[in-house]
A protein has these predicted regions:
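Start-transfer (signal-anchor) and selected internal transmembrane alpha helices
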Residues: 1-57, 367-377
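Extracytoplasmic
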Residues: 9, 47-48, 127-130, 163, ...
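Membrane-interface helix-loop-helix junctions at transmembrane boundaries of multi-pass membrane enzymes
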Residues: 32-40, 226-240, 292-317, 326, ...
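Membrane-embedded helix bundles of polyisoprenyl
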Residues: 47-54, 98, 102, 107, ...
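Transmembrane catalytic cores of multi-pass membrane glycosyltransferases
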Residues: 54-59, 65-70, 94-95, 168-169, ...
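Hydrophobic/aromatic-rich transmembrane helices and adjacent perimembrane loops
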Residues: 163, 170, 213, 328-364, ...
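Signature aromatic-anchored transmembrane alpha helix within multi-pass, membrane-resident enzymes
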Residues: 239-245, 353-397
């Protein structure tokens, strides 16, 4: 046996050389890693810098969530999916891709889902901006520095930050759209066609609205081929889009038709000032600062998909002022999804402006050097104020549309100053709840109760966006004799409910929040 073992070993000289080779590989690893980092430094920066930017509000709020949808919907839905409480039709109608990530992670780790989304938010933001950088470099053929500059401009603009605040499914869907754009431009070969088809399916599965955009972009290409008698191009596009189209129809049916919601919403015969303000007004407000750069850069970006994307979103926003009927989706969501192409046009405009200025004499000699630093400084300062200032101290510009745009990134369904107080009141409520007691919650509080009072889920009554007395009636109809509620004190309430109705009395007040009982 010993002789056999010696025979199977390599000769002593070979063994020594293998050992030396292994040591050299270990010694050279930092050099190899350094070369890789230098080779991909722009792509790494396009991912890591936005990830850091989006991490700032998460750090500022501590262990609590950032974003309305995050705590109001993502956390409760993840808990329900992991517990098997969601049916197939409900799952399909939700556009399930994000929950197909969060629910298994929660089911395996059992970590509070708040932490899952605190980590997911920055990663999704970094991924989306990296995908944009990749498109600018590969799809538009921009140099690395220009592509990184365009990506960072987009990541610092307040509309993009608003998307990152709580529209995680939009970020996921936009990532797949941006990855698909170079393939739509050049989809020669079955491998590229298959990859494009998969990306469209993922964009649809991530979010219904990004699914619409993905299908519109491919559909526009197909129609272009048909009008030019390019039947092979048309057939190829139809084949690529077919799986995504089938999934979208199924998702729309499960999410809108089956529950009886429908695809259209009734509107006034004559547009009101309010409807015009919330649609066209918000669109102008969101991109007012970029309009000069967009106008300058529009001709510098001949990409058909970006133009189709822009025209479609603007046209859909305009449907909000149509008489009688309009889409069920609120128009501001399409204004937000217009962010990526308009930021690309603005970045092209800024680059063109810097390159085209010819200094003369005197003060004009330094003008080209001042344009980019000045714009960058204004962009960074405005982003910093939006990210870091509390909601109550937000700059005036960010308070114009509080129902559509959070005044600050450091809030969720409640402002930063109330986060710890709400957690304390939830703990106090947990100690007062027995078998005959229900905790009624507004949608703003419901996700918090689900996340931090998991043992009391069966005694939570969610009255959504209605008045508290609706929750009282719901609790009584289920046989509860004692009713608790957490809300702000009179005069301090958020979400269009500044005061608490008569019949409630304060049990415990912490800051501007209080635990109430219904008499």
């Amino acid at each position: 046996m010993k002789g056999t073992a010696r025979e199977n070993r390599p000769p002593r000289g070979v063994e020594k050389s293998m050992l030396i080779s292994s040591k050299e590989k270990i010694r050279n690893f930092p050099l190899v890693l350094g070369k890789l980092v230098r080779s991909y430094r722009f792509a790494l920066a396009a991912f890591l810098i936005p990830l850091f930017i989006r991490s700032i509000p998460e750090i500022l709020v501590g262990p609590y969530p950032v974003g309305w949808d995050t705590i109001a919907f993502y956390v409760p839905n993840t808990l329900d999916w992991a517990a098997g409480k969601a049916g197939f039709v409900q799952i399909l109608g939700t556009a399930p891709l994000m929950y197909m990530i969060s629910a298994p992670v929660y089911w395996v780790s059992r970590v509070n889902p708040v932490w899952i989304f605190k980590i997911m938010g920055p990663i999704l933001y970094g991924s989306m901006i990296w995908a944009l950088f990749r498109f600018l470099k590969i799809g538009l053929k921009w140099p690395d520095r220009q592509a990184l500059g365009g990506a960072l401009l987009t990541s610092l603009y307040f509309v993009t930050l608003r998307i990152s605040w709580d529209l995680y499914r939009n970020m996921l869907g936009l990532t797949f759209i941006l990855l698909s754009l170079p393939l739509i431009e050049d989809m020669k070969g079955p491998r590229k066609q298959a990859l494009l088809s998969v990306l469209i399916v993922l964009a649809v599965a991530a979010d219904q609205l990004t699914g619409v955009i993905a299908l519109v972009l491919v559909g526009a290409r197909a129609l272009t081929g048909l009008t030019r008698n390019q039947r092979e191009e048309f057939a190829r596009m139809v084949k690529v889009a077919l799986p995504g189209t089938v999934l979208f129809v199924a998702t729309a049916y499960a999410g809108l038709i089956a529950p009886g919601i429908g695809l259209v919403n009734q509107q006034a015969p004559v547009p009101t000032l309010t409807s015009a303000s919330l649609s066209i007004g918000f669109l102008g407000y969101a991109y007012l600062a970029l309009i000069p750069l967009i106008v300058i850069g529009l001709r510098k970006v001949p990409n058909i998909e970006l133009r189709t994307w822009s025209i479609f979103c603007i046209a859909t926003v305009a449907t909000a002022i149509l008489p009688f009927f309009g889409p069920i989706v609120q128009s501001y969501r399409w204004s937000l999804l217009l962010d990526v192409p308009l930021c690309v046009f603005a970045a092209a405009g800024l680059y063109r402006l810097v390159e085209s200025v010819h200094p003369g004499i005197g003060w004009a000699r330094n003008l080209p050097r001042l344009i980019l630093p000045t714009f960058s400084a204004v962009l960074v300062i405005s982003a910093t104020l939006y990210i870091a200032l509390p909601a109550q101290q937000a700059i005036v510009y960010y308070t114009a549309y509080p129902e559509l745009l959070p005044t600050s990134m450091v809030q969720n369904t409640i402002p930063l100053s109330d986060l710890g107080n709400l957690r304390s009141l939830l703990d106090s409520a947990a100690g007062r709840i027995n078998s005959g007691t229900a905790l009624i919650t507004h949608q703003a509080i419901y996700g918090w109760a689900r996340a931090y009072l998991p043992s009391l889920n069966n005694q939570l009554i969610n009255y959504r966006y209605n008045a508290p007395l609706t929750g009282v009636e719901m609790a009584k109809s289920e046989g509860y004799s004692s009713i608790l509620m957490i809300w702000w004190i009179d005069g301090s309430g958020w979400h269009n409910q500044p005061n608490v109705p008569s019949g409630f009395s304060v049990l415990l007040q912490i800051g501007d929040l209080a635990l109430y009982t219904y008499n």
